[in-house]
């Protein structure tokens, strides 16, 4: 079992991060191996946790690969990763 902290906290945060990464619901869904309707469903959760832990980790990793970092504290948000 992984002890990795998951920073995905709300559907709004997911939508903001996806847009910041330049992804559509369709492209994020394809990258995660789910239908775009699943992404749309998760984003509609607004101020609630959008999905379960296994998906949270996959979503967070996918967004990181597209240059976006999620954070949960002090409030849920997303930012562009620094270029190396």
Predicted regions and their residues:
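A short, Lys/Arg-rich alpha-helix, primarily the initiator
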Residues: 1-19
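Cell-envelope/extracellular anchoring and linker segments
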Residues: 9, 20, 31, 54, ...
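Short basic helix-loop element that most often maps to the first helix and adjoining turn
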Residues: 13-27, 83
């Amino acid at each position: 079992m992984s002890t990795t902290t998951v920073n995905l906290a709300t559907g709004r945060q997911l939508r903001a991060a996806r847009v910041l990464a330049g992804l559509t619901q369709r492209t994020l869904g394809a990258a995660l191996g789910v239908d775009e309707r699943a992404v749309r469903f998760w984003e509609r959760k607004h101020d609630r946790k959008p999905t379960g832990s296994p998906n949270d980790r996959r979503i967070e990793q996918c967004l990181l690969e597209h240059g976006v970092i999620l954070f949960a504290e002090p409030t849920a948000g997303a930012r562009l990763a620094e270029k190396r």
